[in-house]
């Protein structure tokens, strides 16, 4: 794998996808995301042998949004283990990421930890398990990624608080069903802070490289999580990482991954690499149009996927 010239492949892909440049639009329901240049494009691939391949705006920081939910799930599994799955499921949702209808029908148990309701439950677990939830989660993110400079972005977090009515509704509904154990405002403060983190593609590829290396971050040699739980997280990313478009991503790309409405996608090839792509224009499902196309072309050209 290390003999592949990914940088050359990136250039080929960008040239081939020039017709996709104007497709999609940036997220506008979170004011801070609406101000992003829609034409940015960055990508960074880091191999488990510490090779780096970058293209374009790979060192442009952007709001990773729902991608950060991978960290909260990882930390919840470290604390609660398999009991986590009594509070949240492992099935694709098939509905919008902030749907109330499915949640009510299923008695307040979210389908998976990556839709909003599921991530809110995971944050509730962390509020119960951690002495100082916001500080302890941030410390875990910094140490597991090997990037001590990671911070919450208070401007983005406040922007989400002001527009997060649906998330408050989800949390209160689950509270009514007994699946939120702590104060709703406290839980959502952690949730909004988590989703406010900004990283570059280069940082993001490093941060999630542990999922390509059996739970060990090659940059720090830290065992972030066990190989067994690494497998579980990758499986959920494969099935549930792209809102109601997870099947499409699995079909066309063939890698576990997670998207965010900030325009980022991180994808993992276990045993080989982690790649992050950033392009802010989104499709109707909230996934980056161009980032999905880039990753589809990458696995097609390299003939490397998990299938």
Curated annotation (Swiss-Prot):
Residue sites binding substrate per the record: 66, 116, 160, 167, 191, 243, 261
Catalytic activity: L-glutamine + H2O = L-glutamate + NH4(+)
EC number: 3.5.1.2
GO biological process, one term: glutamate biosynthetic process
Keywords: Hydrolase
Molecular function per GO: glutaminase activity
Family, as annotated: Belongs to the glutaminase family.
Alphabetized NCBIfam families for the sequence: Gln_ase, PRK00971.1-1, PRK00971.1-2
Self-association state and partner proteins as the record states: Homotetramer.
Entry protein name: Glutaminase
Origin species: Saccharophagus degradans (strain 2-40 / ATCC 43961 / DSM 17024)
Source lineage: Bacteria, Pseudomonadati, Pseudomonadota, Gammaproteobacteria, Cellvibrionales
Chain's gene name: glsA
